[in-house]
């Protein structure tokens, strides 16, 4: 199995797409053994994250035999440095450009947290190109609670603060370089520690800590993303693509019961509950891979 994983990593090809505005978006492509245009999963990470969040998924997924897998460093993240405003619309347009380059008219988008919001924005902006959506702990405005609801209400202040930070960057203030963040290794260490209630609380504090995120992420981008993450989604009843929702029972940022009620607005949705807090790719990676593969097979998205 270890040898097989090394082979899969070797077969994954890193690519960069230079966009019209000068931004270079980095992504990696794992081509299926039986490749077919349109049979592709685009994997989208969360806030202040990067494509290494999906390393284990790509290495171990049973989908690699029949599906292309594309994991993206959203602009402003990881290997896709960017200046200026980060928006859901810009990320959606970047994904469309990547699909064009790779020869796919449509795709199944798999997004975690902020990545789920990007997937929804893509489906709203490019309805004919969204063949399906897998939303891992999406953040619907009607289901937010606690700190998340507070952040959503203060979104205009976060946007204003982000603008001030960008102005400072333009004047030469701010960090020029950031250390690399390998989430695959971070996730491995986290799983070793997740053995008690106390360690679970420590895990939540660390994985939701702005201080920890800002070690690896620009302040202006972080403030802007805090506003983007809690924007209202496109009308869910207008999304024609089938949807799979993977919801954490812990409900760290959103109430899972309220999330299910909001999700009832989709025309065609299935829900799978997972014993996790908000990071099932870290906490329950095997369950996530199984749920996605079974859904793709059951819905005949192949």
Task: List where the protein language model places each region.
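Catalytic histidine-centered segment of alpha/beta-hydrolase-like enzymes
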Residues: 276-289
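Catalytic histidine neighborhood in serine/cysteine hydrolases
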Residues: 265-278
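Short glycine-enriched nucleophile-adjacent loop
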Residues: 116-127, 133
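Active-site loop/oxyanion-hole signature of alpha/beta-hydrolase fold enzymes
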Residues: 23, 28, 65-110, 114
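Conserved HGGG/HGGXW glycine-rich cap/lid loop of the alpha/beta-hydrolase fold
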Residues: 23, 28-81
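Residue in the alpha/beta-hydrolase core beta-strand immediately N-terminal to the catalytic nucleophile
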Residues: 108, 131-134
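Conserved serine/cysteine hydrolase catalytic core
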Residues: 208-264
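Flexible "cap/lid" loop of the alpha/beta hydrolase fold
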Residues: 124, 133-173
């Amino acid at each position: 199995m270890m040898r097989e994983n090394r082979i899969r990593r070797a077969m994954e090809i890193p690519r960069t797409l230079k966009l019209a505005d000068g931004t270079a978006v980095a992504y990696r492509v794992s081509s299926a053994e039986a490749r077919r245009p349109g049979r592709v999963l685009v994997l989208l990470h969360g806030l202040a994250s990067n494509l290494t969040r999906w390393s284990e998924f790509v290495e171990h997924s049973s989908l690699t035999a029949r599906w292309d897998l594309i994991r993206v460093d959203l602009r402003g993240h990881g290997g896709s440095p960017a200046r200026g405003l980060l928006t859901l619309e810009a990320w959606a347009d970047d994904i469309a450009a990547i699909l064009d380059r790779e020869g796919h008219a449509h795709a199944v988008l798999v997004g975690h947290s902020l990545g789920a919001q990007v997937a929804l924005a893509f489906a709203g902006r490019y309805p004919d190109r969204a063949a399906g959506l897998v939303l891992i702990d999406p953040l619907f405005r009607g289901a937010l609670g606690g700190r998340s609801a507070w952040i959503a209400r203060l979104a205009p202040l976060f946007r204003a603060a982000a603008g001030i930070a960008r102005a400072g960057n333009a004047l030469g203030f701010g960090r020029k370089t950031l250390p690399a963040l390998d989430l695959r290794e971070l996730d491995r260490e986290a799983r070793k520690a997740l053995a008690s209630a106390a360690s679970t609380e420590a895990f939540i504090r660390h994985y939701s800590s702005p201080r920890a995120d800002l070690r690896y992420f620009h302040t202006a981008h972080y403030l802007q993303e805090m506003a983007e993450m809690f924007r209202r989604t496109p009308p869910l009843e207008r999304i024609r693509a089938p949807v799979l929702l993977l919801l954490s029972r812990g409900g760290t940022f959103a109430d899972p019961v309220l999330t299910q009620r909001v999700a009832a607005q989709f025309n065609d949705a299935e829900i799978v509950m997972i014993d996790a807090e908000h990071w099932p790719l870290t906490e329950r990676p095997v369950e996530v891979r199984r749920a996605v593969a079974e859904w793709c097979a059951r819905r005949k998205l192949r």
